[in-house]
Regions:
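Beta-propeller blade termini and top-face loops
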Residues: 1-457
């Protein structure tokens, strides 16, 4: 089934994608990979010929889509962010300065990251954006990478054809055990999707859950007190140049109590049927019997937040209402405060918070006051001070010191996605560009931090 409303819309991503995929229905990963390497070699050749090198022009004051955030409680200045198509950036001074640490990889679309529980220099990075999008460009990845020196060097860990890595979990007591959820390729069916497990730090992987070549796993959660207890959200999803199908009977929740050897569906009290879409999962650290699930239907409408108080045996709907954006497959994540099982955060067009276990939700990142950009994709809650939050969305990175009461934007991240750009030939310092989710913008100076939005949304 294809959503016909999507077929009739002419989105920037359709124009952008069709230019690069014609006459095919997809952009083969190998083609994309080869062209990036070709451009990198061309840049080196130009340098040898004393041709004027490229100069960074910005913007650093606009931002772009963030897909994941990892930070270190022992080292409060250290933050890693993963972006939709700009790779991984690292800061040691809480965002005053950023360093790209993943640029040597030809594919810079990031799905998820995981930081080692005791060594923040060890970071796993899963490539391929898991947010499928409808009016945006989303790229597949080329597997998982790991650094043990904070990004100075990287080791490739395989899973080349997994499409997008939506979640990475590291066993808290035995960090050699790593789980990876794979959504598969976005624009085609493929069997390299499901849940993978490694018992040697990613050197080798075993596929421990597979449903079909059109059903991937969009989220996973672990009971940190009993790390063999795992919960996963499956998502039946497909997209092509003619339309999207973001739901089906293959979407649902599964669980395992033996480290992934046996999986069983968790259905009692949950929605079922052909219209189930994206699902987000979170397990309470303080009360691991409590699990929260955020449900969206196949058309992107919000279905509700469900809670289990018995390790996923049964579910109920606490009743908290959240406004639907109508394209909620674009977000879909849910988080629980590490110190309080009653505090729950739901990410959508804006960010919502509940302080009573999901019975009521209220917005904490409402764009009506121009304080926070829309489309929330990632949240990091500092475990030692849960009032300290980092929020990632289509507009970049934001910081709150009072559990979402107020937000401050952290700039200097050059991750804006441009569809096209133009130079004023009479005044070459004047640059113009059209971007994904950050409007049309311009700069009238040579300053990288002096870009301004002039139209669009």
């Amino acid at each position: 089934m294809v959503d016909s409303t999507e077929m009739t819309e002419n989105k920037p991503s359709d124009w952008f994608f069709n230019q690069r995929s014609f006459p095919l229905d997809t952009i083969p990963q190998s083609f994309y990979h080869e062209q990036v390497i070709r451009v990198q070699k061309l840049a080196k050749s130009r340098n040898r010929k004393n041709i004027q090198p490229w100069k960074f022009a910005g913007p650093t004051n606009i931002g772009g889509r963030i897909t994941d955030i990892e930070a270190s409680a022992p080292d409060p200045g250290l933050i890693y962010i993963g972006s939709a198509s700009g790779g991984v950036f690292k800061t040691k001074d809480f965002g005053l300065t950023w360093t790209p640490i993943f640029d040597q990889n030809p594919i810079l679309a990031i799905g998820d990251m995981a930081i080692h529980p005791s060594d923040p220099k060890i970071l796993y990075v899963g490539t391929g954006e898991a947010n499928g999008g409808g009016g945006s460009v989303a790229y597949d990845g080329n597997g998982i990478f790991m650094t043990n020196d904070g990004g100075l060097s990287w080791k490739y860990l395989g899973l080349e054809f997994s499409g997008s890595i939506s979640k990475i979990l590291i066993h808290p007591n035995n960090p050699q055990i790593v789980y990876a959820a794979a959504m598969g390729k976005l624009f085609s069916k493929n069997p390299q999707r499901g849940i993978y497990k490694s018992i040697n730090g990613g050197d080798t992987w075993e596929l421990i859950y597979f449903q079909s070549d059109s059903v991937g796993v969009i989220d996973m959660a672990m009971d940190i007190h009993h790390p063999d207890t795992l919960y996963a959200a499956t998502w039946e999803r497909s997209r092509n140049v003619f339309g999207i199908n973001y739901g089906g009977a293959g979407s649902g929740i599964i669980r395992s109590f033996d480290g992934g050897k046996i999986w069983s569906p968790s259905t009692l009290g949950l929605p079922e049927g052909d219209n189930i879409g994206r699902i987000g999962l979170a397990v309470s650290s303080t009360e691991p019997n409590k699990i929260f699930a955020q449900y969206v239907d196949s058309r992107g409408n919000f279905l509700g937040i469900y809670r289990s108080d018995d390790f996923g045996h049964s579910w109920s709907k606490p009743g908290g209402r959240i406004n639907s954006a109508g394209f909620d497959w674009w977000f879909g994540k849910i988080y629980v405060d590490p110190k309080d099982a009653n505090i729950v955060y739901s990410l959508g067009l804006t960010a919502y918070k509940s302080t009573n276990g999901g019975q009521q939700f209220f917005p904490i990142a409402d764009n009506s006051n121009e304080e926070v950009h829309v489309d929330q994709h990632a949240l990091f809650i500092y475990p030692d001070n849960t009032n300290n939050l980092l929020l990632g969305n289509d507009g970049g990175l934001y910081h709150s010191m009072n559990a979402g009461g107020n937000w401050r934007k952290i700039n200097n991240l050059p991750i804006t996605q441009f569809y096209t750009c133009h130079i004023d030939y009479s005044h070459p310092e004047r640059l113009y560009g059209g971007t994904q989710d950050n409007s049309s913008m311009r700069t009238l100076t040579t300053r990288v931090d002096q870009w301004a939005i002039i139209s669009g949304g």
